């Protein structure tokens, strides 16, 4: 594993903008409002013929109203303490730290407390004075930061000033004993989960794209790649708690406050010798209830993450039941043919006598997409958590199924012989042959004399038969009917 460097500092000093600039991607949400970043995010800094290294963006370390500024990190209380804990864990993983400060605001008491705190860690520290927009301002805006006793470098994350110099200085902080010619390919092999996330850009798939566009942009068929699982759901459904429980860590900040998670955060872990990555996302609410820009960015990032995952885990609240927003998310994933499963979390809060009725209600409400697995789980007690990853791995395998044309046509003959298509307008549809057009998800095309005569119930019968014959139980599936004498006529 290659070395990492942490970005640490007060809220709104530009850490996330700097993070995005260094990894050359827009992964971290940035906004003028302080405290946007909460959970730590990881990325890779690359350069042509340069040694790659990891960086960790941490949440802004601040004090709440119950602590005095003079207390420094030891005085942090409440929700902000979780952000500090995340930063402490990031620092422990890293070989060095960049203390990011705001050159426009100047040196503040809390910058000094953070510097003292970082000095006690024994890690090399570089003070990065951000928001310095030109060389003519460097001496004036950086002078007072030399009192901290660390090397100082002025940059502008927004305008790109001195960023190449910063990369060079950060590489100089890496331990010499690790410099053994690690190239980009080796870095990708050791951190494929982070690398996949870094590949996301602003022009990724959006909710308005067509099914075909989204299919082309989903994960390619790469059996060796670690299984990538995206957590999706309404705010406070327990997505972060599930990630922590499944990975056996406190990687994600968890609180009773809805909307705690804002960025889409990758959490890599290993189990039974295999590598996996969970992508924890911000809660998705109805557009009419989204009142600020940060939440809008978070929701867009959450939906985009589903197109970059092998399987999406849609988390519902067992106590609240299926809401209208849950139904919209299910319908959206089903329409897009996104591989997904439904996790009904917080089963520990449902009275024992009401559990069976509750499970029955969930199954009835999800009857319109019967292929989607439904698991009842509890992040708090661990109930049924061990079933999630194996089932997700099965869905991924089913999405990669490829069936030879000859085998498909023998199956089609058997299916049609068993149940002939109904006569429509005094003509019975005649089937010629079938082929698999693609996988991810499995897509089949049946050529008939007149596709317009294939009715929805019979199309459903064909799909169910294909699932039964070829063991495609939970993966999404597309079945198209094409007229042999009508070009581009599909149903």
Swiss-Prot record:
Coiled coil: none
Organism from which the protein derives: Nitratidesulfovibrio vulgaris (strain ATCC 29579 / DSM 644 / CCUG 34227 / NCIMB 8303 / VKM B-1760 / Hildenborough) (Desulfovibrio vulgaris)
Record note on quaternary structure: Associates with the 50S ribosomal subunit.
Residues binding GTP 1: 9-16, 57-61, 130-133
UniProt name for this protein: GTPase Der
Molecular function GO labels: GTP binding; ribosome binding
Domain (KH-like) ranges: 401-485
NCBIfam families reported in the protein's UniProt record: GTPase_EngA, small_GTP
PROSITE patterns: G_ENGA
Pfam families from the UniProt entry: KH_dom-like (PF14714), MMR_HSR1 (PF01926)
Key words of the record: GTP-binding, Nucleotide-binding, Repeat, Ribosome biogenesis
EngA-type G domain sequence ranges: 3-178, 227-400
Regions of compositional bias (Acidic residues) in chain numbering: 198-224
UniProt keyword DNA damage present: no
